[in-house]
């Protein structure tokens, strides 16, 4: 066994029939494989789409709805039906399942993040399989493209998983679209997610799902930066989950960073909302970018926005305007403006423990989080 704690993300296209409705046969097959992995000693979390697919026909819709309010209503009905399918099938294998519905706020708010982490830890320690989904009935923003790709990466980072598996209807990341380009080549191992790789991903997904390959690259970036390797592979083949757990089926493996971001750094990079901007001189920029130093008041050039002690701000280099990163400040903007007027400004504005460096590509990639 190569992994002990695995997060599987199963998308809508991997759970539905041709008409967009939930396929009970596909759910049963997924739970069969989960049960075998569970018996082998793996700790498992399933991030599952499919609530809308499970519920829309019960409300009289002839096909999967497109309006947000109709999606929300369908998800409200379908979430219970979807969980019932998972619960019934897993109970036949004497395995307890548990439902957890999350929104972005559960990650952005530190207290709620801690509560979610503790609940998941207890469930895993007790041998249950948490089944996680976006709370689609209330979380409008989470109905955007790629929500559960992102969610699975956030969960994998939260529980410090050994592997995140993104199951989809294609068998990995290609150099081009394999359905239109016969010369497209699958990338089997990715050591670093570059801007070129992001450009390759492009595109959107199928009509039933909401996740394209670009959203999976975002998810892979978040997870690998947090120390979790990611495997993208097809769910269409027999024993897809079993083979993915061993990384033996065709797919694309994204290697984790050797030193994954700790929880505080993850929060700064992916969830903390910036309340202001600080511009620094070249010396301070070099200290932040290349030397791992704290930001001192003496390096400040200008301050804008409205922020207080412990708020998060974005820091830029004066002149070039290049983003340097984000951090939690030790002074509010009014105090900093007063310090800038001083002849000899002193003090630490952002300690290096409260700082995360960001490239322009990473900042753009996570702008929607």
Curated annotation (Swiss-Prot):
PROSITE patterns: GLUTAMATE_5_KINASE, PUA. It is found in: Cytoplasm. Its EC number is 2.7.2.11. ATP binds at residues 9, 168-169, 210-216. Gene3D superfamilies: Acetylglutamate kinase-like, PUA domain. The keyword Heme does not apply. GO terms for biological process: L-proline biosynthetic process. This is Glutamate 5-kinase.
């Amino acid at each position: 066994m190569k992994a002990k704690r695995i997060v599987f993300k199963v998308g809508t296209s991997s759970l539905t029939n041709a008409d967009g409705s939930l396929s009970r046969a596909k759910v049963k097959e997924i739970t069969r494989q989960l049960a075998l992995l569970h018996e082998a000693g793996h700790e498992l979390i399933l991030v599952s789409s499919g609530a809308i697919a499970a519920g829309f026909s019960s409300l009289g819709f002839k096909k999967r709805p497109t309006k947000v309010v109709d999606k929300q209503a369908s998800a409200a009905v379908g979430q219970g039906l979807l969980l019932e399918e998972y619960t019934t099938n897993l109970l036949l294998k004497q395995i307890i399942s548990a439902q957890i519905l999350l929104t972005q706020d559960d990650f952005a708010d530190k207290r709620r993040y801690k509560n979610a982490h503790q609940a998941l830890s207890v469930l895993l320690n007790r041998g249950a399989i948490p089944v996680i989904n976006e709370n689609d009935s209330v979380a409008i923003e989470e109905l955007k493209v790629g929500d559960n790709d992102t969610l699975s990466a956030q969960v994998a980072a939260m529980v410090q998983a050994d592997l995140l598996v993104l199951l989809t209807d294609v068998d990995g990341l290609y150099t081009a679209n394999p359905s239109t380009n016969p010369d497209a080549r699958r990338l089997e191992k990715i050591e670093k997610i570059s801007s070129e790789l992001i450009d390759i991903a492009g595109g959107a997904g199928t009509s039933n799902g909401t996740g394209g390959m670009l959203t999976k690259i975002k998810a892979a970036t978040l997870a690998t930066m947090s120390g979790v390797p990611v495997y993208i592979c097809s769910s269409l083949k027999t024993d897809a989950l079993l083979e993915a757990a061993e990384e033996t089926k065709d797919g694309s493996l994204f290697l984790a960073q050797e030193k994954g971001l700790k929880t505080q750094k993850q929060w700064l990079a992916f969830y903390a909302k910036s309340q202001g901007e600080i511009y620094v001189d070249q010396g301070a920029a070099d200290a932040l970018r290349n030397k791992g130093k704290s930001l001192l008041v003496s390096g400040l050039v200008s301050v804008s926005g409205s922020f207080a002690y412990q708020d998060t701000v974005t820091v830029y280099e004066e002149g070039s305007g290049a983003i340097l990163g984000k951090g939690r400040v030790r002074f509010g903007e009014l105090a900093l403006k007063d310090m800038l007027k001083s002849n000899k400004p002193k003090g630490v504005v952002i300690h290096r423990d409260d700082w995360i460096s960001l490239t322009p590509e990473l900042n753009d990639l996570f702008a929607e989080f």
